[in-house]
Amino acid sequence: MPGYSDNIIRNASGLIPMVIEQTSRGERSYDIYSRLLKERIIFLLGEVEDHMANLVVAQLLFLESENPEKDISLYINSPGGVVTAGLAIYDTMQFIKPDVSTLCIGQAASAAALLLCAGAEGKRFCLPNSRVMIHQPLGGYRGQATDIEIHARETLAVRERLNNIMAKHTKKTPDQIMRDTERDNFMSATQAMEYGLIDKVLYDRQVAGHSTDL
């Protein structure tokens, strides 16, 4: 089973909790994230960047190969990050056969908010004190005037693509998404539900419908 990168986990918390599992062959130890991966739970933690995106994509593909009919849960606590890394995860979520249920714990901002709303319809959740933030993509470039113009056009094209994706999953128009993301737009869990970014605010485990008892 592909486990989580030790460096990623140490950088996030400074410590990797370990759990011991009793098997017919004796004891086996896992880091906590690999143990949860056995329950089809993937964590998207911290900044969305290429290495983290590769890790999440690999786990999505692995879980699909294990059981293409069983849902995958993606737990999100992220300030966002690189657009292309976020889109790599997004495309994989849409590509694989299992439904991907998303759950915001803490925050889902920028690219992470896009991934939150991209979960399977009816299976997008927030915990009650989570925060969600949407905005237009950020970009900066220094160089010759012609190159700056090229990068400005690319940023506008990326913005249009992101607006269309979010419009698809929230059932709003791209024009409304453009207006609402003109500046940082922070929402509570309830506001995110009203906006269409999620389907339900979870106040207890029973409502979530996850099969695991963890």
UniProtKB/Swiss-Prot annotation:
GO cellular component, one term: endopeptidase Clp complex
Catalysed reaction, written as an equation: Hydrolysis of proteins to small peptides in the presence of ATP and magnesium. alpha-casein is the usual test substrate. In the absence of ATP, only oligopeptides shorter than five residues are hydrolyzed (such as succinyl-Leu-Tyr-|-NHMec, and Leu-Tyr-Leu-|-Tyr-Trp, in which cleavage of the -Tyr-|-Leu- and -Tyr-|-Trp bonds also occurs)
PANTHER family in alphabetical order: ATP-DEPENDENT CLP PROTEASE PROTEOLYTIC SUBUNIT (PTHR10381:SF70)
EC number, UniProt record: 3.4.21.92
Entry-linked InterPro entries: ClpP (IPR001907), ClpP/crotonase-like_dom_sf (IPR029045), ClpP/TepA (IPR023562), ClpP_His_AS (IPR033135), ClpP_Ser_AS (IPR018215)
UniProt similarity note: Belongs to the peptidase S14 family.
UniProt-annotated location(s): Cytoplasm
Known partners and oligomeric status: Fourteen ClpP subunits assemble into 2 heptameric rings which stack back to back to give a disk-like structure with a central cavity, resembling the structure of eukaryotic proteasomes.
Disulfide bonds: none
Active site: 110, 135
Protein name: ATP-dependent Clp protease proteolytic subunit
Species this protein is from: Legionella pneumophila subsp. pneumophila (strain Philadelphia 1 / ATCC 33152 / DSM 7513)
Primary role: Cleaves peptides in various proteins in a process that requires ATP hydrolysis. Has a chymotrypsin-like activity. Plays a major role in the degradation of misfolded proteins.
Lineage: Bacteria, Pseudomonadati, Pseudomonadota, Gammaproteobacteria, Legionellales
Keywords for this protein: Cytoplasm, Hydrolase, Protease, Serine protease
Origin superkingdom: Bacteria
One GO process term, biological-process aspect: protein quality control for misfolded or incompletely synthesized proteins
Recorded GO MF terms: ATP-dependent peptidase activity; ATPase binding; serine-type endopeptidase activity
